Amino acid sequence: MVTTYLLFIVAYLLGSIPFALVVGKIGYGIDIREHGSGNLGGTNTFRTLGKKAGFIVTIADILKGTLATSLPIIFALDIHPLWFGLAAVLGHVYPIFAKFRGGKAVATSAGVLLCYSPVVFAILAVVFFSLLFTTRYVSLSSMVTAVVAVIASIVSGDKIFIIAMCLLAGMVIYKHRANIGRIINKTEPKANFSKKQK
């Protein structure tokens, strides 16, 4: 039982590692929270620091979700891995290492899915990038993909999977509430695939 509690804390702490902040300060000498949207996530990193930093942060944020979800498997615990994944996402959104001001749950949630259901992860990746290249809205693509994740979990019939996806989708949409208003007002920034970045 003690091991379980400790690993839940480890999962939260893994999620709390603010890679966008670390990459910004160490690699570029800036606090990314003071630039762009101020968000500690991949999208703001791409827009503020460029492609290289954006890819590094996004991959790192995905992997921390994957690693956290793997903890009960690695330590042979009889507890559903998605609970540990949720702890990591909570850490990503409210990181203790960055004054509880984190990202929007997208990449780390993807990492959770990568560990728990690679097939669903692959399907959602196709959905996300199809929407992104069609609409050029990262926020809209993220929210719609989150809803599709819920639908996929319902189709699976796995009750814990359904609960976890509902919680993650709810968190993703909640963290994008400001984006929803900007999309409606047509002031939401679009991804610019032709723009040269660092």
Swiss-Prot record:
Transmembrane segments: 4-24, 71-91, 113-133, 147-167
Pathway(s) this gene product operates in, as recorded in its UniProt entry: Lipid metabolism; phospholipid metabolism
Main EC class the enzyme belongs to: transferase
InterPro entries documented for this protein: G3P_acylTferase_PlsY
A single cellular component GO annotation: plasma membrane
GO biological process: phospholipid biosynthetic process
EC number of this enzyme: 2.3.1.275
Protein topology in the membrane: Multi-pass membrane protein
Record's subcellular location: Cell membrane
Keyword annotations from UniProtKB, A to Z: Cell membrane, Lipid biosynthesis, Lipid metabolism, Membrane, Phospholipid biosynthesis, Phospholipid metabolism, Transferase, Transmembrane, Transmembrane helix
Keyword Magnesium found: no
GO MF term set: acyl-phosphate glycerol-3-phosphate acyltransferase activity
The keyword Nucleotide-binding is annotated on this UniProt entry: no
HAMAP family listed in its UniProt record: PlsY
Subunit structure: Probably interacts with PlsX.
Family listed: Belongs to the PlsY family.
Function summary: Catalyzes the transfer of an acyl group from acyl-phosphate (acyl-PO(4)) to glycerol-3-phosphate (G3P) to form lysophosphatidic acid (LPA). This enzyme utilizes acyl-phosphate as fatty acyl donor, but not acyl-CoA or acyl-ACP.
Protein name (record): Glycerol-3-phosphate acyltransferase 2
